[in-house]
C-alpha cells in the first residue's frame, strides 16, 4: 500500500519548485534562525564546537543554541534520517527549546536539527561530525524534508 503525504500528483521536484516561488523562496532566502546564525559562526571560524569523549559535540552544540540538556525526550519512532539506527534499545533523544530541536542517536555521527525561522518557518539541518578528525559540517536542508514524501507499507 502506498501513502502519499502532501499532494499525490506532485513529485518532489515540482514541490520544491513551489517552495522557491514568492513569497517563500526557500532556497534563496537566508535563514535568520539560531542554527543558521551558528552555521555562519562555524563556517567563518569564529566558533569551534568542543568535543566531549562520551557525547562528541552534542553538549557544546546544545550550549551554543541555548537548548537545555534537561529538556529532552526519548523517542523510538522511525521519523528520522537515521531510522536504521533507532530501536527500543537505542532510542533517539530530542532536545528542545522554544525555537530549536536537536535529534541525537547514540552511535551516530549525524545530528538532526530543526529551527523556527521568522520568515521561512521550520528549517532543517544536519550536523555531520567526522569521528576521526575535529571536522564537522552543519548543512541546511535544501527543501527535501518539506516536499511530499511517499511511504510504502
Label the predicted regions.
Residues 1-4:
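Bacterial N-terminal signal peptides
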Residues 10-81, 91-93:
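Conserved small-residue
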Residues 18, 26, 95, 101-104, ...:
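Sequence-level detector for tyrosine residue identity
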Residues 56-61, 95-100, 130-134:
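Short alpha-helical segments and helix-capping/turn motifs at coil-helix boundaries
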Residues 82-105, 114:
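N-terminal low-complexity, intrinsically disordered segments
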Residues 104-153:
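Sequence context surrounding c-type heme c attachment/ligation sites in exported
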